[in-house]
Curated annotation (Swiss-Prot):
This is UPF0741 protein SE_0364. It comes from Staphylococcus epidermidis (strain ATCC 12228 / FDA PCI 1200). Belongs to the UPF0741 family. Residues 103-113 have a biased composition (Basic residues). Residues 68-102 have a biased composition (Basic and acidic residues). It comes from the Bacteria. Keywords: Coiled coil.
Length: 113
């Protein structure tokens, strides 16, 4: 089973360019998905990545890469990964819904002016 990394291109603490390079070097065969991961709170203060649907965060990229390496050495449980995948998808769906409602509200206020 291929490893999967999810990294954010919007969070302040994530340096997308260097993190992506390090993850590719660690596992060239892994699938890397770039985009908002709806993990904004921790993403303001810590660099993070989802490794096989499990969130990992650290204050520095070096610390994060140590955690990623440890996580990749652990045995994988397909049922647990599926549960985590569903949880992540639900979190993303809720964030998109909140964003949509906020845009509608702002659009409505603008129209009232």
């Amino acid at each position: 089973m291929k490893n999967k990394f999810l990294i954010c291109d919007e969070c302040q603490a994530v340096n997308l360019k260097s993190l992506k390079r390090k993850l590719e070097k660690l596992d060239p065969e892994a699938e890397i998905e770039i985009g908002c991961q709806s993990y904004c709170g921790p993403g303001r203060r810590k660099t993070f990545a989802f490794v096989n649907n499990r969130p990992l965060a650290a204050l520095t990229e070096e610390e994060l890469m140590e955690k990623v390496t440890k996580q990749l050495k652990k045995p994988r449980d397909p049922e647990e990964e599926e549960r985590l995948r569903k949880r992540n998808e639900e979190r993303k769906r809720r964030k998109e819904e909140q964003d949509r409602k906020l845009k509608e509200k702002l659009k409505k206020r603008k129209a009232e002016k």
